[in-house]
């Protein structure tokens, strides 16, 4: 018995110590950091870090007449490792408590656990001094890029890196100081940090985000003279007129903030028209005004400070025209007007341009949709239900005007699968918004072929819109079809100076390098703000900065992580290849033989096919304590779980590719299908499947069958007849490596993102009666269903 006890004790002694985060003790610092965006101070962080490892900070961010304060405290254990982190903000209090290598994060009565990796460092978005912890643990003797686990407060484990860059001496506050500079690699962004010999942080620069943290008294570290001769320098002070009432043709006045250089003379004008509160654009306005532009920010009709009734889409063409011409006629204006902005703020540019105001010189519509029939609120006849009601909720709660994020967080917390399940769809505004919403109901009462939409459709008006346009979007932009359709329509009319930039980004006007767990490298981050300024400098000021001599088109290829450039889109080297749906769930570049049996499934609106990408925890699941790792695995496995368990999703896949396949540009699909219904929907997804089975979505298209020929003249189906359907799968750019598979999925619903087709031929959003549909997908030589890929020859890629 004694020997057995001794053996157990020896085993315990030999076991490795429980994995612990890195210590915070043995270092002390306190002071104030200031947060800058471009030249503007956005906030301050007051902090105190004590030698026992305790840390406290108070961060205050101020913008648009609002201030938000975030208070954080870190309490250490006896070894100086964090034991408890508490973060208080207007959204609530998050508490992270560690026991050994497991931390429990609690927010709004929801708790999840996080496994802390050995020697994990801490990082806080508004606690820059914490970066000193990683710097002090850096092995200078070893050098190079050193990886380490990072706990991003309040409790997300990531991998980060730190690399010594150089030493630099600067004179600050009357004394010479030698700084060590490191590149701190946080997932998706690199931060250049300046520290002293003890590891104390003085300056943290985030070039990709135009942001910087600088210690109070050391502002000289970020005051680097503008040396780019191709850009207008930031040399002007700013004067601001708030709430100027710009008159419209019907007498309504729209509230407009006008920023102007504090100087004599006339200046070109940049206009932003927004439904999201004009004050929220003040940082952008100040950036351009310092560089010699008058900048006007206007609340759209019926929004915030502007008079009139808010009705999305409908009055924007005339209001945009009238505002442009009013600005051009002001005594401080050169008469040249440009526009910029993303999403709806990009949309209003197209509406204004379609009316050809004489003084509109150029536009930069970032991530802008096309006509409302091809994206929001309809996409080729299919009603974008979640997108439409979510946007209405954001507008009605004025969530975009709330700097604290409280209003938006309430919108995002809603459980859409449950809320959007009842019929009819038109009544869902009551469930989500708590009341009837006039424009939600207008969208539904007027289907795509209704003349109601004529004032909002601009694509057919672009023939005579001969202005230079800077189109910008991303492969994962939820409005990305706009950059495709808008660019292609302008190009089809032969309009010159159509610049197009498509990167591995989402719905944003800035560049990033990550989507989910995929990192596309530093090549993906380009300085778009610099390019926008150069564009305006050339077209509004006549500055010969070379932008007109550069290739007009730049598209990013994921996987090979490089840019391809040319002057037209698709690129001239593009070779369109058909990849065919075939018997047995195969996807092949060869035309399948004739006589293959079709594939069949039943689509039942009573149990609508779920969107495999719409993962949402139920309220009961949220109350269950689970690990963040398990939740992540469940989210990642959800797509495959849905396609495996459902019988109403057809899957076609290639064999593992023998060699890499690169395609970049517009994607489409052709389906030959029949249905027992008078009307139904078709959805096609394109995906990459990694060696381990993980799915990476690339593109999706959809069409409501009655609109297969025309958006203006719907035609119901004849039951059982085979029809050809053309589906627009938007666009993407990627190299699929050898060993991975290409996959196509076909379904007839994508709930709750899009409203279900009831299969009756009636009004799908105003009726409740529904019937199942027997769906048949044909393939083979007679009915060659396929996806069309814009293949790029391997020789065009950089080695």
Regions found by a protein language model. Give the residues of each.
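C-terminal, loop-rich substrate-recognition/catalytic regions characterized by aromatic stacking residues
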Residues: 410-427, 501, 517-799
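Cap/lid segment of the alpha/beta-hydrolase catalytic domain
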Residues: 261-329, 378, 511-520, 644, ...
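Short beta-strand/loop motif that positions the catalytic acidic residue
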Residues: 465, 471-473
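Alpha/beta-hydrolase fold nucleophile elbow
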Residues: 332-344
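N-terminal mature ectodomain segment of secretory-pathway/periplasmic proteins
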Residues: 36-109, 199, 204, 363
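Solvent-exposed helix/loop surface patches that form functional interfaces
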Residues: 26-28, 42, 91-179, 198, ...
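N-terminal cap/lid segment of alpha/beta-hydrolase-fold proteins
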Residues: 228-265, 653-659
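Accessory cap/linker subdomain of secreted extracellular hydrolases
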Residues: 146-148, 290, 351-464
